[in-house]
């Protein structure tokens, strides 16, 4: 603030006239001054000069006081100066020491880098030496032949576990030396003759051991799978030969295939011969045709001296399936039939059971042998299939021959169809086991079966077509009840449908053709037999009863969707419609004729021609009013007695009554036409509701 005052005083002395710029300068200086000091100066009222002098005086006093203080404390200040100089020297030495330490640290860091580099080189040398040591040790181990291994190869029996381990070691040494090559190692040249000698000794022992095991397959009644298991445990024997003596390996392979082929041939030939002797004595024969009439045994002296043996058998099993279809599901993979045990227990079997047993035996041996060949001989794909086919070719041929002979003797269509389905299921089994399916074999067997099945079914068709109807007549007429030939047909058809269901597949085109031909032959027979009925009504009743029998036997959820069921159902409905018209004709035939003629004229618009029926209305109404109640009673009593199936009879009765009411409604509608409106007789017709109330009395309670 004193400086401000001085500046203001000087400015006032020099120039009393203030400009705007000088005023602004003064104000800016004033703002920078201490506000309290400014207030104090203004409050004192002193001028700038007085303030200046006062400040100068005070400054001089302060200067003198400071100088005096320094003089009074000169010794302390001198000591402080000396101390500061001493500290500077200490700090200078400390700085020099730190610089020296820094230089030493730099040299230590460089030494550490050098040591680290040396350590890396040493570590690398150590690793290289260790690798060389490992390789060298392995090489020494590979070429070194221990006395223990030599003694084991030469003296130990091939069945001993130690021999197998020594053989592995020998194979390992020879293989590695061959992979490495001889090189310049002298030790290899010294070792190889020893290894070659041991290899020859091992080849001889292994070959003899394998041949001995294979010769055991030829022993009668031996379980060859036990020997195969022993071979698999020593599979490395063959692998050793395969690597070191290919000629011996091929010799053993050929020997095994030849031995196992002969063994399977003998086994299946003996098994088939004994198995098919267990066939049931009461199987179907050529005489058991669908249309066969006479099943009676010959009687009298002719029967006594007859050389032919007659077997009494249950003919129901010829055409009905019973539980035989279980062979496709629950009994499919059941135990094989053991011939000698079955003979001791006096058991006999249907052909399909014998067929299943021999084919299952073939499939099991076929699958097992394929897996053994691929596992033991280390082959796959085409090579494995070729070896397998060689091993099973003879067995396949003997099974085919045996089956062909037995199939050619069969007259059982159900059994043949079951065998066809069995072939399909065995094919699926082989696919599940991931074994070649031998499609040629199954196609051949299936071809035999289809050929025989078509022949047997053709025999059935021809027997139906050649039925002598005169032998079926009693007292000059045929019974209207279901015929036994039709029942046989229905049971046989139901059997085929159940077999198709049990097989788990849709019925093929071949089987559908067989069933359609069978249905066609039965339809022709029914047409011939119905023509021999005495009345048209009996003809329809005969057809309905027989068609209903067929549908009732094959009636199940699966069969309802088959073509055969649809055909028979359509034929039955047509016969029912014809029968309904035939039943109504004697009772309201006059009304039916009137309704049909008038409706035709009304549709065509021939009103003038319709007028002439006015005179007939009275006769129709009078006849109906007089006869409708007795007609209802007569229809009921007659219809119930005609049909063997009570449920069918009541259903047809309700159909007749429904048609009866429909004709009344149609007749009533015709009477409402303008042409008949003025005819007073129209109002005399019995009300249709009254007729319906009467009909309700005959409605079944269930």
Curated annotation (Swiss-Prot):
One of the record's GO molecular function terms: syntaxin binding
Annotated Gene Ontology cellular component terms: cytosol; GARP complex; Golgi medial cisterna; Golgi trans cisterna; perikaryon; perinuclear region of cytoplasm
Tissue: Ubiquitously expressed, with particularly strong expression in neuronal cells. Specifically expressed in head and tail neurons and in the pharynx and ventral cord motor neurons.
Alphabetized UniProt keyword annotations: Coiled coil, Cytoplasm, Golgi apparatus, Protein transport, Transport
UniProt-listed GO biological process terms: endocytic recycling; Golgi to vacuole transport; lysosomal transport; negative regulation of dense core granule transport; positive regulation of dense core granule transport; positive regulation of locomotion involved in locomotory behavior; protein transport; retrograde transport, endosome to Golgi
Sections of the chain in a coiled coil: 505-535
Similarity-based family: Belongs to the VPS52 family.
Protein name in the entry: Vacuolar protein sorting-associated protein 52 homolog
Organism: Caenorhabditis elegans
Highest classification ranks of the organism: Eukaryota, Metazoa, Ecdysozoa, Nematoda, Chromadorea
């Amino acid at each position: 603030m004193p400086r401000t005052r001085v500046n203001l005083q000087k400015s006032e002395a020099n120039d009393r006239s203030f400009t705007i710029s000088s005023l602004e300068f003064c104000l800016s200086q004033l703002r920078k001054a201490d506000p309290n000091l400014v207030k104090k100066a203004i409050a004192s009222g002193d001028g700038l000069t007085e303030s200046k002098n006062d400040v100068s005086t005070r400054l001089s006093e302060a200067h003198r006081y400071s100088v005096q203080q320094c003089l009074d404390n000169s010794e302390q200040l001198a000591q402080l100066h000396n101390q500061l100089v001493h500290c500077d020297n200490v700090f200078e030495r400390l700085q020099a020491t730190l610089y020296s330490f820094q230089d030493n640290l730099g040299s230590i860091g460089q030494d550490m880098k050098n040591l680290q580099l040396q350590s890396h080189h040493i570590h690398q040398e150590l690793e290289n030496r260790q690798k060389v040591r490992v390789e060298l040790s392995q090489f020494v181990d590979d070429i070194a032949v221990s006395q223990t291994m030599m003694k084991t190869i030469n003296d130990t029996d091939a069945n001993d576990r130690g021999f197998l381990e020594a053989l592995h070691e020998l194979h390992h040494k020879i293989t590695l030396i061959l992979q490495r090559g001889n090189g310049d190692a002298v030790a290899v040249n010294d070792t190889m003759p020893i290894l070659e000698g041991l290899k020859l000794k091992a080849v001889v022992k292994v070959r003899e051991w394998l041949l001995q095991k294979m010769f055991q397959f030829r022993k009668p009644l031996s379980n060859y799978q036990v020997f195969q298991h022993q071979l698999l445990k020593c599979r490395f024997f063959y692998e050793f030969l395969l690597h070191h003596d290919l000629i011996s390996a091929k010799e053993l392979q050929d020997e095994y295939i030849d031995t196992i082929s002969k063994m399977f041939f003998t086994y299946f030939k003996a098994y088939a011969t004994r198995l098919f002797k267990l066939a049931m004595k009461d199987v179907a024969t050529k005489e058991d045709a669908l249309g066969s009439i006479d099943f009676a045994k010959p009687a009298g002296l002719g029967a006594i001296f007859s050389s032919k043996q007659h077997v009494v058998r249950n003919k129901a099993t010829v055409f009905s399936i019973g539980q035989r279809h279980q062979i496709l599901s629950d009994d499919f993979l059941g135990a094989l039939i053991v011939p000698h045990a079955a003979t001791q227990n006096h058991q006999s079997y249907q052909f399909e059971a014998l067929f299943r047993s021999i084919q299952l035996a073939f499939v099991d041996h076929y699958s097992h042998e394929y897996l053994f060949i691929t596992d033991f001989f280390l082959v796959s794909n085409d090579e494995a299939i070729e070896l397998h086919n060689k091993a099973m070719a003879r067995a396949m041929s003997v099974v085919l021959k045996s089956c062909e002979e037995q199939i050619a003797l069969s007259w059982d269509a159900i059994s043949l169809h079951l065998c066809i389905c069995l072939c399909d299921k065995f094919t699926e089994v082989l696919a599940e086991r991931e074994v070649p399916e031998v499609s040629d074999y199954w196609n051949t067997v299936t071809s035999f079966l289809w050929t025989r099945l078509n022949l047997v079914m053709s025999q059935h068709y021809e027997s139906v077509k050649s039925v002598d109807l005169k032998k079926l007549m009693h007292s000059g007429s045929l019974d209207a009840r279901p015929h036994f030939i039709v029942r046989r047909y229905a049971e046989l058809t139901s059997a085929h449908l159940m077999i198709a269901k049990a097989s788990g597949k849709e019925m093929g085109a071949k089987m559908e053709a067989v069933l359609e031909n069978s249905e066609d032959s039965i339809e022709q027979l029914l047409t011939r037999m119905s023509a021999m009925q005495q009345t048209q009504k009996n003809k329809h009743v005969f057809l309905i009863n027989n068609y209903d029998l067929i549908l009732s036997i094959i009636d199940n959820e699966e069969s309802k969707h088959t073509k055969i069921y649809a055909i028979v159902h359509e034929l039955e409905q047509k016969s029912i419609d014809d029968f309904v018209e035939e039943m109504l004709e004697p009772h309201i035939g006059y009304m039916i004729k009137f309704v049909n003629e008038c409706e035709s004229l009304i549709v065509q618009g021939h009103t003038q021609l319709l007028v002439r029926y006015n005179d007939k209305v009275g006769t129709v109404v009078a006849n109906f009013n007089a006869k409708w109640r007795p007609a209802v009673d007569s229809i009921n009593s007659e219809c119930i007695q005609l049909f063997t199936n009570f449920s069918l009879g009541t259903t047809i009765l309700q159909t007749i009554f429904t048609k009866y009411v429909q004709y009344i409604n149609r007749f009533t509608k015709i009477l409402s036409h303008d042409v008949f409106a003025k005819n007073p007789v129209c109002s005399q017709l019995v009300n249709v509701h009254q007729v319906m109330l009467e009909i309700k009395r005959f409605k079944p309670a269930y």
